Amino acid sequence: MRIAFVISEHAGGLLPERMGQYHAVERRLAHLARAEVTTVHYSELGAVGADATVLSGSADPWSAHDPTALDDLFGSLRARNEPVLGICAGMQLLARAGGGEVRTASRPAGPGFVNVDALDRSDLLAGLERRVSVWEHHTDEVLPLPMGFRALATSEHCAVEALAADDRRWWGTQFHPEEWNGDHPAGRLILENFLRLAGIPLR
């Protein structure tokens, strides 16, 4: 089985220090999943087949991205059938691909662990407490919730902390579940839940 890990940074932002962060996410996925993890830039997604796709975050604002390249990505996402998880900017990409909007957050969050309240624990957030601590760092947010999506989590500084589009098997988190540790384990369970939803066996 294969997981496509998609780097959502624009081409000019693929700096060595950022690539190190993305490779760390790749290693976390490989640590959890009995599957090959293939890392690609979002401009290459259309040429890669996968059983599940994970969209990374992005350090730079959307204005730094080529609008045509983003439109091509949205088309590729809509044409694919496998489950997709969007992380931070990756969630924003899913919302935009689904007809939603992204705007500057009124209260930028992080960097650091913050409390998030689960609204729907039926799939991606299954097994979590109602309030969990997750790592967050973002200046934009999805608002309003796009039509056909449901909100899974919220917080005092971000109305849509996690979402799902059931008809497409898309899930997203505004926070970074890959940033877990012994004191803040929720992110690991969220990634494991996504892998189960995608039919990817766990190690």
Model features per residue range: what roles?
Residues 8, 42, 89, 175:
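Cofactor-binding loop segments of dinucleotide-utilizing enzymes, especially the Rossmann-like FAD-
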Residues 175-203:
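Acyltransferase
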Residues 24-25, 72, 150, 189-193:
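Alpha-helical elements of Rossmann-like donor-binding domains used by nucleotide-donor carbohydrate transfer enzymes
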Residues 96-166, 170-171, 175-185:
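Pocket-forming structural segment of enzyme catalytic cores
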Residues 13-14, 62-64, 95, 181:
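Glycine/Thr-rich phosphate-binding loops of Rossmann-like dinucleotide-binding domains
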Residues 5-32:
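Short, charged N-terminal beta->alpha structural module
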Residues 27-86, 98:
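Flexible gly/pro-rich beta->alpha loop and the following alpha-helix that scaffold active-site loops
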Residues 87-95:
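Glycine-rich nucleophile elbow surrounding the catalytic serine of serine-hydrolase chemistry
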